[in-house]
Swiss-Prot record:
Pathway linked to the protein: Cofactor biosynthesis; thiamine diphosphate biosynthesis
Documented EC number(s): 4.1.99.17
Protein's name according to its UniProt entry: Phosphomethylpyrimidine synthase
Binding-site positions, [4Fe-4S] cluster: 590, 593, 598
Binding positions (substrate): 248, 277, 306, 342, 362-364, 403-406, 442, 469
GO cellular component: cytosol
Domain of life: Bacteria
Function: Catalyzes the synthesis of the hydroxymethylpyrimidine phosphate (HMP-P) moiety of thiamine from aminoimidazole ribotide (AIR) in a radical S-adenosyl-L-methionine (SAM)-dependent reaction.
Gene name for this UniProt entry: thiC
């Protein structure tokens, strides 16, 4: 991969399409208990209800916003300088970290001294890395277990509630029918949650900072927030919160540049990526990651074994604990928020994959399996796990314990190798928690629908309710090019059953490296799956957006329908393919049914007739049927008429 001169020039910038506010939307900030707790949300403005339907005001709705300052017209975006260090003051105030004299990883120092990388380096970082003071633990779990509510926890509580209470109050104040309108728009179907301590058993109707603290303390949720990534906006991953999604980006040995990866990151968070994983395996991994982290308002995850493998020229058998340890420190000092570590791939499990249809499909899993077989020894990740915990708690890096033996086909789903590894991940979780290190567990993979719930149930049991983070799962293997759909089905199901974060799949899965369009398609598909899961679980306020869009649809407020949806651009594009004129944006029909057969228009006509006649809608329908019956007889009682 070569340096992109335009990207590295003084006027380097992100794609204009990624920084423009979404239609009829603006960035708003909700202030917490102190002035520097400013929680971003997206406010979507709505038009008034047409006079014929009552003429009431429709106040703005608020939705979760992952785009950081990029969609704020007031923010100055300079990717060479990076984002503001939002959390720096909070980290300083705790007084338990120390600023290092410089990088402490051997590889980091080597890259910094290499003149060949000078033009690739991120130029805007003017601070040295931090780590915990000797004997200190700086993890959010450690603070939570001490009974401390951090600013990050308060920030998250405000963010998860999405100003739902304020929205309902604004409905009540919207006019004489305000109370009735608030009751209608706030209505939500009861959810059905699964597993121990399922949502609703101990969760408040409104998320509080104390509830956030308690969920992190018991390990049921994590706040990925490395002290060296102060630019990140705090978020939480846990099944008693909104289901989150992750987007994967990263270069390979044959394609992509630093600039393209930063563009993918900003594009992913625009459409709703809650976290981003940099899975780069090509050249300049260190420099690419620095640019991404410094410009990312969301947590960044990595798979450190990928870079460690590059350091030994791709020979898995040449990997050592010392090389891997140095890689962990290198990435922790850059600010990576969570590491995928395949410590559950043990020597004893590798032979269990011999009878699989598709063997070991995880890159990290196959690397460690090859190392174990080459040395006929237990994995150094497993053997040195407690030492890894010491590194993690010094920077507050969260574990994402990797499923290196996940099934790569539905043929292999829920087999002995997969479940053996899952049980080991549960044992490792207990060790990490002993160090107050945050943990989530990665899950499959390819699983048919009838076996999905078993995965969730076993994970809750064996991993003691640590958050589950799954890739799909893909529910069938027959649709290359459509695996965002095959996996979206499984993602919605497992999210309902209790998975806390879903790793997106793009249409390019199994076929190639995704471009920006593929990233957007994967994000939107997974936002849909996550939201469907929130509805099914009965998460407080999950139905507000659905209700608002449905009301706009019934009232033919086309622009509001587009703007409240997950992808306003595509909705508008599809509508305009057949009805492009501005007048169609206020028409009481669309191109599917036309003006005479629109079910919603017919319903409105019935209501209008009922109001004029002073009768109920049921009586109006009865009278209407009687009139039509007379017409039918008068025209010859023929079902079909020849023209």
């Amino acid at each position: 991969m070569n340096a992109n001169p335009k990207f590295l020039s003084a006027d380097a910038h992100v794609d204009a399409a990624a920084v423009a506010p979404l239609p009829n939307s603006r960035k708003v900030y909700v202030t917490g208990s102190q002035p520097d707790i400013r929680v971003p949300m997206r406010e979507i403005t709505q038009a008034d209800t047409p006079t014929g339907f009552g003429g009431e005001k429709n106040p703005p709705i608020y939705v979760y916003d992952t785009s950081g300052p990029y969609t704020d017209p007031e923010a100055k975006i300079d990717i060479r300088a990076g984002l503001a260090a939002l959390r720096q003051g909070w980290i300083d105030a705790r007084g338990d970290t120390e600023v290092l004299g410089g990088l402490s990883s051997e590889y980091g120092l080597e890259r910094a001294a290499d003149p060949a990388t000078a033009d690739l380096r991120f130029p805007g970082l003017h601070r040295n890395p931090r780590r915990a003071q000797a004997g200190k633990n700086v993890s959010q779990m450690h603070y939570a277990r001490q009974g401390i509510i951090t600013p990050e926890m308060e920030y998250i509580a405000i963010r998860e509630n999405q100003r739902r209470a304020e929205y309902l109050e604004s409905l009540k104040a919207s006019g004489p029918n305000g109370a009735k309108l608030a009751a209608m728009m706030g209505r939500q179907h009861p959810g059905q949650a699964f597993g121990a301590a399922a949502f609703g058993a101990n969760a408040p109707a409104e998320i509080t900072p104390e509830f956030v603290r308690s969920e992190v303390a018991c390990g049921r949720a994590i706040i990925p927030a490395n002290i060296n990534h102060p630019e990140s906006e705090p978020m939480i991953i846990g099944r008693n919160f909104l289901v989150k999604i992750n987007a994967n980006i990263g270069n390979s040995a044959v394609t992509s540049s630093i600039g393209e990866e930063v563009d993918k990151m900003t594009w992913a968070i625009r459409w709703g990526g809650d976290t981003v994983m940099d899975l780069s395996t090509g050249k300049h991994i260190h420099e690419t990651r620095e640019w991404i982290i410094r410009n990312s308002p969301v947590p960044i995850g990595t798979v450190p074994i990928y870079q460690a493998l590059e350091k030994v020229n791709g020979k898995a058998e040449d990997l050592t604990w010392e090389i891997f340890r140095d890689t962990l420190i290198e990435q922790a000092e850059q600010g990576v928020d969570y590491f995928t570590i395949h410590a559950g791939v043990r020597l004893q499990y590798v032979p269990l994959t011999a009878n699989r249809m598709t063997g070991i499909v995880s890159r990290g899993g196959s690397i460690m399996a090859k190392w174990c077989l080459a040395h006929h020894k237990e994995s150094f990740l497993y053997e040195h796990f407690e030492e890894i915990c010491e590194i993690m708690k010094a920077y507050d890096v969260s574990f994402s314990l990797g499923d290196g033996l996940r099934p790569g086909s539905i043929y292999d789903a829920n087999d002995e190798a997969q479940l053996g590894e899952l049980k080991t991940l549960g044992e490792l979780t207990q060790i990490a928690w002993k160090h107050d290190v945050q943990v989530m567990i990665e899950g499959p993979g390819h699983v048919p629908m009838q076996l999905i719930k078993e995965n969730m149930d076993l994970q809750l049991d064996w991993c003691k309710e640590a958050p589950f983070y799954t890739l799909g799962p893909l529910t069938t293997d027959i649709a290359p090019g459509y695996d965002h759909i095959t996996s979206g089905i499984g993602a919605a199901m497992i999210g309902w059953f209790g998975t806390a974060m879903l790793c997106y799949v793009t249409p390019k899965e199994h076929l190639g490296l995704p471009n920006k369009d593929d990233v957007k398609e994967g994000i939107i598909t997974y936002k849909l799956a996550a939201h469907a899961a929130d509805l099914a679980k009965g998460h407080p306020g999950a139905q507000v957006r659905d209700n608002a869009l449905s009301k706009a649809r019934f009232e033919f407020r086309w622009e509001d329908q587009f703007n409240i949806g997950l992808d306003p651009d595509k909705a508008r594009e599809f509508h305009d393919e057949t009805l492009p004129k501005d007048s169609a944006k206020v028409a009481h029909f669309c191109s599917m049914c036309g003006p005479h057969f629109c079910s919603m228009k017919i319903t409105q006509d019935v209501r209008e007739f009922a109001a004029q006649q002073g009768v109920s809608e049921t009586e109006a329908l009865k009278k209407g049927m009687e009139v039509k019956a007379v017409e039918f007889v008068k025209t010859g009682a023929e079902i079909y008429h020849r023209q």
